């Protein structure tokens, strides 16, 4: 789940905790950078500080809402008086956390927001004998839990969302890695290789097919129709 974090003082540990929780995090420190990032990528959730070097984060969020963007937004700030909190929610924020932030609470609140934002449709993805809960980050094959490492789980999620269709390599890389990450040239291939191992060992009735020069597609195996 790709996240835009607009802040200047959150520690690397917070970003690491979000990564461990299944969030690919892009970190920027100004509203100008936030606008550039927001309009060049697709984000599932925003984390926003109020006081930024080039303006008020609340004004920026207010403009997004007036332009029709409904992506969930969590405000994080040391400013915590009642009037400010009321202003935060009246400006279109979905949640507020006072700094210093507990990463466990932050992740729990983010997942709750994402769960509510997707409740109009069933969040469970089913393909063959595999079930995936994108909010709980849980995978099962024939009802048996399948533990998959975070990066490979992100690959699986994006392939499942477009099952049966070709997912371009560039699109996968864009969704999997934030622009703050240092990514080796064969990182995606290595992740695909490991994910194929997970699926094969679990008896999943689906496979990842390489479309040379383009990307990858997730398809059912012959066993799924036997």
Curated annotation (Swiss-Prot):
Q: What's in the GO CC field?
A: cytosol; protein-DNA complex
The residues forming the signal peptide are none
InterPro entries with a match to the protein in the record:
CheY-like_superfamily (IPR011006), OmpR/PhoB-type_DNA-bd (IPR001867), Sig_transdc_resp-reg_receiver (IPR001789), WalR-like (IPR039420), WH-like_DNA-bd_sf (IPR036388)
State the DNA-binding region(s): 122-220
| PROSITE patterns cross-referenced by the UniProt entry | OMPR_PHOB, RESPONSE_REGULATORY
Q: Where is this site: Ancestral phosphorylation site?
A: 49
**Keyword Transcription regulation attributed:** yes
SUPFAM superfamilies xrefs: CheY-like (SSF52172)
Cellular localization per UniProt: Cytoplasm
The yes or no answer to whether the keyword Transcription is present is yes
The UniProt entry, under PANTHER family, shows: REGULATOR OF RPOS, TRANSCRIPTIONAL REGULATORY PROTEIN CUTR
This one is known as: Probable transcriptional regulatory protein y4xI
């Amino acid at each position: 789940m790709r996240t835009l974090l607009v802040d200047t003082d959150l520690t690397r540990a917070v970003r690491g905790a979000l990564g461990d929780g299944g969030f690919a995090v892009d970190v920027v420190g100004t509203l100008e950078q936030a606008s550039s990032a927001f309009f060049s990528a697709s984000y599932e959730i925003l984390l926003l500080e109020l006081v930024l070097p080039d303006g008020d984060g609340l004004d920026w969020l207010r403009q997004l809402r007036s332009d029709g963007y409904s992506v969930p937004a969590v405000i994080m700030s040391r400013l915590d008086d009642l009037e400010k909190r009321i202003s935060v929610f009246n400006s279109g924020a979905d949640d507020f956390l006072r700094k210093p932030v507990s990463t466990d609470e932050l992740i729990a609140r983010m997942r709750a927001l994402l769960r509510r934002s997707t409740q109009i449709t069933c969040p469970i993805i089913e393909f063959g004998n595999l079930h995936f809960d994108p909010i709980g980050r849980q995978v099962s094959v024939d009802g048996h839990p399948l533990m998959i490492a975070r990066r490979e789980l992100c690959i699986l999620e994006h392939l499942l969302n477009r099952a049966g269709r070709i997912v371009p390599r560039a699109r996968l890389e864009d969704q999997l890695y934030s622009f703050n990450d240092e990514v080796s040239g064969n990182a995606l291939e290595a992740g695909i290789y490991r994910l194929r191992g997970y699926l094969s060992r679990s008896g999943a009735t689906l496979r990842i097919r390489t479309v040379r020069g383009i990307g990858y597609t997730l398809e059912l195996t012959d066993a799924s129709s036997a």
